[in-house]
Amino acid sequence: MTRLQLALDEPDLEVAVTRGRELIDLVEIIEVGTPLVIEYGMESVRRIREACPGVEVLADLKVMDVGRLEAALAFRAGADWVSVLGVAADATVRGVLEAASDAGGRVLVDLIGCPDIPMRAAELLRLGANMLCVHTAFDCQEAGVGPLDELSQLLEVTPAERAAVAGGIRPETLPAVAELAPEVVVVGGYLACHSQPREAAAEMRELLTGEQVR
């Protein structure tokens, strides 16, 4: 069954902690978003880990260099997952994977900006990446760009259980994404901006899994 990941991208740690606690029973993974990591460092990972027991925590570091060291910091802070960019060098990806192996953690590779997703995905799978994520950049979403085509490309070479998708996913786009059955669907901005985030998260979960949670 596809899992739902909550991306906490607001750069206010107290707001993020509150949102994580509010939605913890509706998601399987909580992401400590890049803005939080930039603003608060590893303290953001520690706080979300402490506030949200029972779910997996992903530190969205988007590692581009110094892979082993940077990933180790997040794993020591309590992350279950760390993200590395797919455009990073293989040596960097290997470093993140080594840190994950040392810590018993896992690695998500963010394919944002990758010019050839099937080719790079195949390379990353050979390196041992646990999860590959197609990701429509926030700055491109206003132009109507979405991740569906890239998800289809990813699934040409990647087992669904190692595929994730992120970027502007909303109730009206979720059914088409869910039909492709990736392992993880990441939702951030839609829930962050919603006046009733718990109701919105429940709706997304129902659309994704078919289970009634309201």
How should each PLM-predicted stretch be described?
Residues M1-R68, R76, I117, A122-L127, ...:
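Conserved N-terminal beta1-alpha1 strand-loop-helix module at the mouth
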Residues P35-E39, L61-V63, A88-D90, C114-P115, ...:
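Short C-terminal domain-edge/linker segments immediately following a structured domain
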Residues L4, V66-A160:
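Conserved anion-binding
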Residues T2-L8, I30-V32, V57-L61, V82-V84, ...:
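Hydrophobic faces of well-ordered beta-strands that scaffold small-molecule active sites
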Residues V96, L151, A178, G189-R214:
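C-terminal helical cap(s) of enzyme catalytic domains, especially alpha/beta-barrels
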Residues I24-V27, C52, A100, T158, ...:
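Structural signal for hydrophobic packing residues in well-ordered secondary-structure cores
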Residues V145, L151-E179, V185, Y190-L191:
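A C-terminal functional module that forms or caps the active site or interfaces directly
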